[in-house]
Amino acid sequence: MKKMLSVLIAAVLATQTLHAFAETSPVGSWQFAYYHVPGGGFYANQTICFKEDNTWYSSSQAGWKGAWFQNGDDLQWNGSVPMPGAGSANNLATIAMGKLAVAGSMSGNYAEWAAPSALPLSWDRHYTYTMTYKGATCAAPK
């Protein structure tokens, strides 16, 4: 009886640990809303899918993809997206740094710039962002 009780307690604790990890992991589909800096005016919504292999992609913006890194509640994700007229390669580099505030929500700062490009940059934009968890299933990349 004691052994069965010990196994049951261990199973409950393991389930709670996995549940806590799932709440803080960014893996899954997120609604990404970003806002102009300065001013705070709304700019756009996108859908981002964070994958278990530490890569991500957009299911709403064609070709936008990259890699992500998490340290505790800090999340950094960077990548690139084809953008006609942006720099000599028609490409934007992107980076976001934020925090997982509570389960299902994160926010931070986001920037995009023409890459490669001569200074002064022809495209250099800065935003704040919020993200809301949509679910474990991601739509296909656009």
Q: Locations of the language-model features?
A:
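N-terminal signal peptide c-region/cleavage motif recognized by signal peptidases
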Residues: 15-17
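Tryptophan-anchored aromatic micro-motifs
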Residues: 23-42, 58, 64, 68, ...
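Repetitive helical segments and hydrophobic/amphipathic motifs
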Residues: 11-12
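Generic structural detector for well-ordered beta-strands
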Residues: 31, 49, 67-69, 99, ...
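Beta-sheet ligand-binding and adhesion/scaffold domains
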Residues: 34, 40, 74-142
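N-terminal helix-cap/turn-to-beta initiation motif at the start of protein domains
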Residues: 19-31, 47-51, 135-142
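N-terminal glycine/threonine-rich, aromatic-flanked beta-hairpin/loop signature
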Residues: 40-80
